[in-house]
UniProtKB/Swiss-Prot annotation:
GO terms for biological process: translation. This is Small ribosomal subunit protein bS16. GO terms for molecular function: structural constituent of ribosome. Keywords: Ribonucleoprotein, Ribosomal protein. InterPro entries: Ribosomal_bS16, Ribosomal_bS16_dom_sf. It comes from Buchnera aphidicola subsp. Schizaphis graminum (strain Sg). Belongs to the bacterial ribosomal protein bS16 family. One of its GO terms (cellular component) is small ribosomal subunit. Gene3D superfamilies: 3.30.1320.10. The keyword Ribosomal protein applies.
Length: 85
Protein backbone atom coordinates (compact mmCIF):
# COMPACT_ATOMS: atom_id res chain seq x y z
CA UNK A 1 0.00 0.00 0.00
CA UNK A 2 1.30 3.46 -0.91
CA UNK A 3 1.07 6.24 1.67
CA UNK A 4 1.70 9.98 1.72
CA UNK A 5 3.48 10.72 4.98
CA UNK A 6 6.17 12.81 6.67
CA UNK A 7 9.79 11.69 6.83
CA UNK A 8 11.90 13.20 9.62
CA UNK A 9 15.17 14.93 8.72
CA UNK A 10 17.23 17.60 10.45
CA UNK A 11 19.31 17.49 13.60
CA UNK A 12 18.74 17.29 17.32
CA UNK A 13 16.17 19.89 18.44
CA UNK A 14 15.90 21.20 14.83
CA UNK A 15 13.33 18.96 13.11
CA UNK A 16 12.69 19.22 9.40
CA UNK A 17 10.15 17.08 7.56
CA UNK A 18 9.75 16.04 3.93
CA UNK A 19 6.34 14.98 2.68
CA UNK A 20 6.95 11.84 0.65
CA UNK A 21 5.13 9.05 -1.14
CA UNK A 22 6.36 5.72 0.18
CA UNK A 23 5.33 2.11 0.41
CA UNK A 24 3.90 1.42 3.87
CA UNK A 25 6.48 -1.36 4.36
CA UNK A 26 9.39 1.10 4.09
CA UNK A 27 10.74 2.69 7.27
CA UNK A 28 9.70 6.23 8.16
CA UNK A 29 12.96 7.82 7.05
CA UNK A 30 13.89 5.14 4.52
CA UNK A 31 13.25 4.74 0.82
CA UNK A 32 10.51 6.75 -0.82
CA UNK A 33 8.99 6.98 -4.29
CA UNK A 34 8.65 10.75 -4.66
CA UNK A 35 9.14 13.92 -2.61
CA UNK A 36 6.02 16.12 -2.56
CA UNK A 37 7.16 19.00 -0.37
CA UNK A 38 8.68 19.99 2.94
CA UNK A 39 7.70 21.35 6.35
CA UNK A 40 10.01 23.27 8.69
CA UNK A 41 8.24 23.87 12.04
CA UNK A 42 11.07 25.97 13.52
CA UNK A 43 11.58 28.31 10.55
CA UNK A 44 11.73 32.00 11.37
CA UNK A 45 10.36 32.98 7.96
CA UNK A 46 6.62 32.33 7.55
CA UNK A 47 6.85 31.87 3.77
CA UNK A 48 9.34 28.99 3.86
CA UNK A 49 7.65 27.00 6.63
CA UNK A 50 5.50 24.81 4.36
CA UNK A 51 5.80 24.08 0.63
CA UNK A 52 3.79 21.40 -1.17
CA UNK A 53 3.18 20.27 -4.74
CA UNK A 54 -0.62 19.94 -4.75
CA UNK A 55 -0.75 18.64 -8.33
CA UNK A 56 1.37 15.62 -7.41
CA UNK A 57 -0.59 15.05 -4.18
CA UNK A 58 -3.83 14.91 -6.19
CA UNK A 59 -2.16 12.57 -8.69
CA UNK A 60 -1.13 10.12 -5.97
CA UNK A 61 -4.54 10.31 -4.31
CA UNK A 62 -6.04 9.33 -7.66
CA UNK A 63 -3.69 6.34 -7.75
CA UNK A 64 -5.05 5.20 -4.36
CA UNK A 65 -2.42 6.52 -1.96
CA UNK A 66 -3.58 6.94 1.62
CA UNK A 67 -2.66 10.15 3.45
CA UNK A 68 -1.49 10.15 7.07
CA UNK A 69 -3.42 12.28 9.57
CA UNK A 70 -0.62 14.82 10.08
CA UNK A 71 -0.12 15.15 6.32
CA UNK A 72 -3.85 15.82 5.87
CA UNK A 73 -3.67 18.63 8.44
CA UNK A 74 -0.68 20.19 6.68
CA UNK A 75 -2.40 19.98 3.28
CA UNK A 76 -5.47 21.77 4.70
CA UNK A 77 -3.21 24.42 6.26
CA UNK A 78 -1.41 24.90 2.94
CA UNK A 79 -4.73 25.25 1.08
CA UNK A 80 -5.88 27.92 3.55
CA UNK A 81 -2.60 29.79 3.12
CA UNK A 82 -2.90 29.64 -0.69
CA UNK A 83 -6.49 30.94 -0.59
CA UNK A 84 -5.53 34.00 1.46
CA UNK A 85 -2.65 34.95 -0.87
Amino acid sequence: MVRIRLALYGTKKRPFYKMVVADSRFSRDGRFIEKLGHFNPVSKCQNSTLKLNLNRIEYWQGKGAQISKRSQKLIKLFNKKEDTV
